[in-house]
Swiss-Prot record:
One of its GO terms (molecular function) is ABC-type phosphonate transporter activity. The lineage of its organism: Archaea, Methanobacteriati, Methanobacteriota, Stenosarchaea group, Halobacteria. Keywords: ATP-binding, Cell membrane, Membrane, Nucleotide-binding, Phosphonate transport, Plasmid, Translocase, Transport. Its main location: membrane. It is found in: Cell membrane. This is Phosphonates import ATP-binding protein PhnC 1. Its EC number is 7.3.2.2. It is an enzyme of class 7 (translocase). It catalyses: phosphonate(out) + ATP + H2O = phosphonate(in) + ADP + phosphate + H(+). It comes from Haloarcula marismortui (strain ATCC 43049 / DSM 3752 / JCM 8966 / VKM B-1809).
Length: 273
């Protein structure tokens, strides 16, 4: 059944794109992203695919401003109509365990720093309907009053995603939003992502190539930190996919996301970006 969720106020004008200009990012001397140039337009649905360690998550964190490039620039391109330009929902995002799912999602409206999380309950909006709609969209409205610490890993991920959607950002970045979900829920989550947006740019890292090809307009294939192809979904070929994943398998020594002295996963990411 289609959710009643409508994520953006009527009349909101979105015109924000994202530009990577010759971007390189290193960790401990290892290159995670190398010489990437992309221009992503407002309203596009972009899936980033590739083998593990290809630089996909690093690319999203550069887009969110959680990481800075060593070479090149990342910038927003277009007119911004809100104070919140980009929101990042990534796998394993930290939630406040002792608070309920609803309380966590409500904090998505705030631009507070993470260290204030334990002190913000008095500031939470008194009308929970928008947060309940987002929980409904991810299939958790029946768990709204359950403390996050009692939720499964997949449920926690969906709560984090619902919270990110509360920010009314113009660029939405989702790192493996279908991870830890059962097969029947994966397509629902992708449908939720699409329905949530109205003119915003969506950039999603996915491991499920079939979902990427079915639900996204544009596919960016990454391996060894490089963009191997950037193609409309309808034009992606089996040969391109075979070469993409073969490239990742043949270059394990360049996997900076896993082998750098400063691992990407060790770098804290602000929950509010």
């Amino acid at each position: 059944m289609k959710s009643k969720y409508t994520a953006r106020p009527e009349g909101k004008q979105s015109g924000q794109g994202l530009v990577f200009d010759s971007v390189t990012k290193r960790f401990g001397g290892k290159v995670a992203v190398r010489d990437v140039s992309l221009k992503l337009e407002a309203g596009e649905r972009v899936a980033v695919i590739g083998p593990s360690g290809a630089g996909k998550t690093t690319l999203l964190r550069l887009a969110a401003g959680a990481l800075q490039p060593d070479v090149g620039t990342v910038r927003f391109d277009g007119s911004s109509s809100t104070g919140s330009t980009a929101t990042l929902a990534y796998q394993g995002e930290t939630l406040v365990d002792r608070r309920t799912a609803l309380s966590n999602v409500l904090t998505g409206r705030l631009g507070a720093l993470s260290w204030l999380r334990g002190f913000i309950e008095p500031l939470l909006p008194q009308h929970p309907e928008p947060a309940l709609e987002r929980l409904d969209a991810v299939g958790l409205v029946g768990r709204a009053d359950v403390p996050v610490k009692s939720l499964s890993a997949g449920e926690r991920q969906r709560v984090a995603f619902a919270r990110a959607l509360m920010q009314d950002a113009e660029v939405v970045l989702a790192d493996e939003p279908t991870a830890n979900l059962d097969p029947s829920s994966r397509r629902n989550v992708i449908d939720v992502l699409d329905a949530a947006l109205d003119g915003e740019l969506l950039v999603t890292v996915l491991h499920e190539v079939d979902l990427a090809l079915e639900h996204f307009d544009r596919i960016v294939g990454m391996a060894d930190g490089r963009v191997r192809f950037d193609t409309p979904a309808r034009a992606v070929t089996d040969d391109q996919l075979d070469a993409l994943f073969a490239a990742g398998a043949s270059t394990p020594g360049t996997d900076a996301e896993r082998t750098g002295t400063e691992k990407e996963s060790d770098i804290p990411v602000p929950w509010y970006v």
